[in-house]
Amino acid sequence: MGDQRVIRILAMVASHTGKFSNTYRLAQAVLQGARAAHPAIEEEFVFLSDHDVRPSTGCITCLRKGYCPQQDDVPRLQERILAADGIIFGSPVYMLHVSAQAKAFLDRCLGWAHRPPLQGKYVVTIASSLGLGGDLVNGYLAQVWTSFGAQVVGSVEGQAIIKGMWLNREQVLEETARAGRDLVRAIL
């Protein structure tokens, strides 16, 4: 590609096992696909379990006043999203839905669905599972990020019973590489 500007990609992992998770492994693989398409990438990983993300209280101050009164790490995490060109957001599948960490964080971004600040941002969603629910999680994540104004350009589902041992290995490797390339193409 002729454009060698630096692309900022933020990978958010919503697994409580962090760097030991399949979700992290999938995010790394998407980034590898992005780097293959464009070497000038500045990447950052955020593990939601390392941050103070309190659940929504339902007070709707974010809708009425445009900010959340809770004092935790969510505003700083939102700033990192706003500073990125592309976002990779991954969650394990728990009971056919996103993890508690993912749900708490996304609920706290409710104000973004009413004042979407992410136009011009591109997202790849990731769901890692033991075999069921990845399509449901990726569908939910696509709806949420689209409501925030972002364009979802790819989704990846990895199924593994043993960490890193993908049941659909070839498909997963293909999907992650394609998702990374598509993320770069959308940004450029």
What do these predicted regions represent?
Residues 1-91, 96-111, 174-179, 184, ...:
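N-terminal beta1-alpha1-beta2 submodule of the flavodoxin-like/Rossmannoid cofactor-binding fold
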Residues 16-20, 95, 129-132, 161-163:
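Short histidine/acidic/glycine/proline-rich micro-motifs that form metal-
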Residues 65, 90-93, 125, 129, ...:
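Conserved short-loop catalytic and cofactor-binding motifs
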Residues 100, 134-139, 167-171:
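A short secondary-structure junction signal
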Residues 112-116:
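Conserved helix-turn-beta segment immediately C-terminal to the redox Cys motif
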Residues 117-158:
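Short, glycine-/small-residue-rich phosphate/pyrophosphate-handling segment
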Residues 143-188:
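Active-site/pore-lining binding-face segments in mid-to-C-terminal subdomains
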